[in-house]
Amino acid sequence: GKITARMHLVTKKLKLYRKNSMSIKNLNPLLKSIKFKSNKFSKLEFFLKNNLKDINRYWPKNLPNGIIHGDLFIDNIFFKKNKLSGILDFYFAGNDYFMYEIAICINALCFDLKGKKFIINKQKIKSLIEGYESVKKISSREKSAINVLCRGAALRYLLTRLYDYSNTPKTALIKIKNPN
């Protein structure tokens, strides 16, 4: 949380703007581009459309924003002795809500695998938020929006993985992440 907050404070001073290509506004076109009929996830389409509609209805307006990394997933960060030691892959960096970044982190880093299920780890969320707030305070408006921001972040990653799964040729030399 601390390094993310520091990154947000530093980038807030930059006079740069780049639209977040994976913002909530981009999820509907992404959803429409998934070939549901041709893969084993065809029953998800209705569920995903309804969820996106609901997320859009409750998506917050005018939260504090600036440049975010936009992809703080486990394969883009390094830890040394349980401390964040490095961040890479700024391909998806762009302007969006700072709390959307925290929602991405919650989705990526605050679950534990128990058997075959991922279980939310509230202590990890608490540590992430406390670390962030030790550097940059989170407003009550931001805190009240975190649930819908987390839903949006989760949907974003599910949709990108479904897109890759349904649209990438089998001969492509890339590793496709399992949408499950």
What residues fall within each predicted segment?
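A cross-family kinase active-site recognition segment
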Residues: 1-43, 63-65, 173
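Active-site cores enriched in adjacent His and Asp/Glu residues with nearby glycine-rich loops
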Residues: 42, 67-69, 141
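A structural signal for short hydrophobic/aromatic patches embedded in well-ordered alpha helices
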Residues: 48, 128, 145-146
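Active-site acidic catalytic loop and adjacent metal/ATP-binding pocket
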Residues: 53-100
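Active-site activation/catalytic loop segments of kinase-like enzymes and analogous catalytic loops
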Residues: 99-136, 153-168
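All-alpha amphipathic helical-bundle segments outside canonical DNA-binding/catalytic cores
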Residues: 140-150
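Regulatory N- and C-terminal appendages and interdomain linkers associated
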Residues: 176-180
